[in-house]
Amino acid sequence: MLHRYLPMTEEDKQEMLKTIGVASIDELFADIPEQVRFRGELNVKRAKSEPELWKELSALADKNANARQYVSFLGAGVYDHYIPAVVDHVLMRSEFYTAYTPYQPEISQGELQAIFEFQTMVCELTGMDVANSSMYDGGTALAEAVLLSAAHTKRRKVLISNAVHPQYREVVRTYANGQRLEVKEIPYNGGVTDLEVLAAEMGDDVACVVIQYPNFFGQIEPLKAIEPLVHEKKSLFVVASNPLALGVLTPPGEFGADIVVGDMQPFGIPMQFGGPHCGYFAVKAPLMRKIPGRLVGQTTDEEGRRGFVLTLQAREQHIRRDKATSNICSNQALNALAASVALSALGKRGVKEMATMNMQKAHYAKSELQKRGLLSPFAGPFFNEFVIRLNQPVDDVNARLRQKGIIGGYNLGFDYPELANHMLVAVTELRTKEEIDRFVNELGDGHA
């Protein structure tokens, strides 16, 4: 070989030239004018050995502030959670790692069963009847829920809370624009959706109402009070939810939600600089035939053996083409598998304990910050995120925290001008009391 990363020998080169009927490289490129050809050595660095390459790439990677080297209090949709070691071991099995959409069930039973288990666990978490095999992420899952609602109700207006993740709202608007849907935002009041404004906006032209639970500020929305406002007008109730929070909160399905979506990143999926992650999509039974994406069902073969197959395929783009419920294809099957393995490793009790730890540690952090004079503009129950008001720009505070080995919270001023100098703080089960106290002291000592 001429180079270890370019596995071509001189014999290989001559064989290829002979096959195409030319005698040399110069003859191959004879149609390129001489005056534009480059002669000489390219001004590039010499090739590195493998140890040298590892050292250089590691140095480049270390420039990033990551959760292995820093203590992270940054959330806003992507969280630093515990990932059981077994997750990567299962993911790296070649039959999962390289698998595509399992159109041939007779040779894909392992993949199909894994997807079926994912769907089952999503239904158990959300309190819904049917879940699909995954979506790209939480934002696209929410956008697909809006499209389903418009198609089902044959209405064009969408009401979405301003307390829904700002990036989710942008994705919804992008999808809605192509379908000529009207998207109207409902303001928040006290950190949760303003129910008086929502009630005033409800009408016979509303396809759906979109609420996040917990919402972007970490607050717990009053789904029980919202549901009758929505269904009184025969609109659909769409809830975007952090699946980990459902380990301690009442599932949206028990509050009458018609569609529940979200991102499975808290279970077994690294932060990965924002993606790829894995969306989930669950519905009540009447909407089953309009759900986007793959559905795996359990059946028995002619010999009475249990088996798994893709079901209700007539909805999908490989059959219906332009009339399909959506054009999502392979989805995020590998990340869905990661979530399934993590959930299986934790078990029901483990998920509840993990969610409880998130909630308890977040409440401890907020309480300690309030003792130092760093108050929250919002009262009411919250899960593992909360908002605090600073006396300095959030970016300045975060720059100081990074010098101390801490990744601070999200700058809410980016998306909410009225919340300039407000930080969204996330506290997960991985944060220790010592780390939380250190974070509190750094903010307090700096008179943030």
Curated annotation (Swiss-Prot):
In short, the EC number is 1.4.4.2
SUPFAM superfamilies, A to Z: PLP-dependent transferases
Gene Ontology biological-process entries: glycine decarboxylation via glycine cleavage system; nucleoside metabolic process
What catalytic activity does the UniProt entry give for this protein?
Answer: N(6)-[(R)-lipoyl]-L-lysyl-[glycine-cleavage complex H protein] + glycine + H(+) = N(6)-[(R)-S(8)-aminomethyldihydrolipoyl]-L-lysyl-[glycine-cleavage complex H protein] + CO2
Pfam families cross-referenced by the UniProt entry: GDC-P
GO MF terms here are: glycine dehydrogenase (decarboxylating) activity
Q: Which UniProt keywords apply?
A: Oxidoreductase
Range of residues in the leader sequence? none
Q: What family does the Swiss-Prot or TrEMBL record give for this protein?
A: Belongs to the GcvP family. N-terminal subunit subfamily.
Q: Quaternary form?
A: The glycine cleavage system is composed of four proteins: P, T, L and H. In this organism, the P 'protein' is a heterodimer of two subunits.
Q: What does this protein do?
A: The glycine cleavage system catalyzes the degradation of glycine. The P protein binds the alpha-amino group of glycine through its pyridoxal phosphate cofactor; CO(2) is released and the remaining methylamine moiety is then transferred to the lipoamide cofactor of the H protein.
HAMAP family of this UniProt entry? GcvPA
> What is the recorded name of this protein?
Probable glycine dehydrogenase (decarboxylating) subunit 1
Organism, by scientific name, is Geobacillus thermodenitrificans (strain NG80-2)
Q: Which gene encodes it?
A: gcvPA
